Amino acid sequence: MLTVISPAKTLDYDTPPVTQRHTLPQYLDDSQALILQLRELSPAQISELMHLSDKLAGLNAARFGSWTPDFTPANAKQALLAFKGDVYTGLDAESLGEDDFTYAQDHLRMLSGLYGLLRPLDLMQPYRLEMGTKLANARGKDLYAFWGTRISEWLNQALADQGDDVLLNLASNEYFSAVKKSALKARVIDVDFKDLKNGQYKIISFYAKKARGMMSRFVIQERINDPEQLKRFDVQGYYYSPEQSKPDHLVFLRDHAE
């Protein structure tokens, strides 16, 4: 089973990594093509394209300018440890052990607007490029066109390498839309996390994002390889709802946030 999650806007390059092991992103030719195009944009154009403040636009213009295809621990950090935000708060990668990182490297992937698909230990230089960015390029009108069926093909290969065909989707709609299901040779399992609010179970963004991270961690630590085992997930008060679930769409409820 392979799990996919979204990246995060918030990055941490200040905290020393808890593991020295690292690998290189596998699709850097594509990343470099995007970087070369992004370097042609002024900070004002970046601000308009990405809906960023002038300060953030300037920061990311500088990031694009300093990006290099030569990745080292001095200019990059393992993706799973560099990303912050709600999903990664739930995942809490800093407290994983070396055996956990080994398992995650084979069973977890992060979708990325710039890198396409990242493994946990892949070194990543800092960037901001949301998958939904309407950056016209040589392959089409946006990043979905740029990546085309590539991400699906890479996921197919990762699944084939482990002799499986189950893809656990814990990514946002924006990012999972980059996975072309028509090209995917996998059974996709979708998951919703709902919290009780005003007498109804609803998807509350902050809690749902954190829960995606918690389930990712659960899969890693419990070495889950069968979707049926996902129903055991009970972290921080969530429980499986057979009434609301379908075979390929699991729903977890929580009555009180912890």
Curated annotation (Swiss-Prot):
InterPro entries: YaaA (IPR005583)
GO cellular component, one term: cytosol
Gene Ontology biological process terms, A to Z: response to hydroperoxide
One Pfam family in the UniProt entry: H2O2_YaaD
HAMAP family referenced in this protein's UniProt entry, alphabetically: UPF0246 (MF_00652)
UniProt-listed PANTHER family: PEROXIDE STRESS RESISTANCE PROTEIN YAAA, PEROXIDE STRESS RESPONSE PROTEIN YAAA
Family classification: Belongs to the UPF0246 family.
Name of the protein described by the UniProt record: UPF0246 protein PSEEN4534
